[in-house]
Amino acid sequence: ESAISEIMKKIIREQESKIITPIDDKMFFSLLIFYSLQLFRTKKMMSKALEKIEGFILNRGDEEIVLDDSQKKTLLKCMLYITSFQFALRIEKECFAIKIYKNHTKINYITSDSPAIFYNDDSVAAMPLSPRLFVQFSLNKKIKEILPARIGFETIDIYNTEKIKRINKLIHDFSDDFLFAKKNVDLNFDF
């Protein structure tokens, strides 16, 4: 995770600069992994998984060991971590376009305790990267179709506060319990 964090910091630094820097394959996959980790390693996802799983039992020969709640949570965190990488590999095959929205308004992008957004019949994956950057992956759910050899990359400059408010409203709608903003004005969703 620390390696992914370093790559994410580099991506954010480069994308926030005035010079347009295309995302290379390593950065692309790091973005997908970061997105997937943010999607699967949330309190809500943990709770959903714990609701569905009554218990874990380890078998060693004839011996059965029932995991306690603490051990169950630790094992589940590992499972969700692995699932995150599997999901990143899946959406890597489906992704045909990446858009990075650069915010040039006085309102910042907000984030939440569940920042990864998956919507529009699971054809769009999106997430705020910083108060000034928002990433969107367009996915092709028809895996049988041939995808382009190279993923389309586009940087979109946003100067309209209404667009930022709409994105922030979307982030709000997909949040679990908490929203995080730099300023109170960032939490105003009036259009």
Regions found by a protein language model. Name each.
Residues 1-191:
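Alpha-helical structural context detector biased toward long hydrophobic helices
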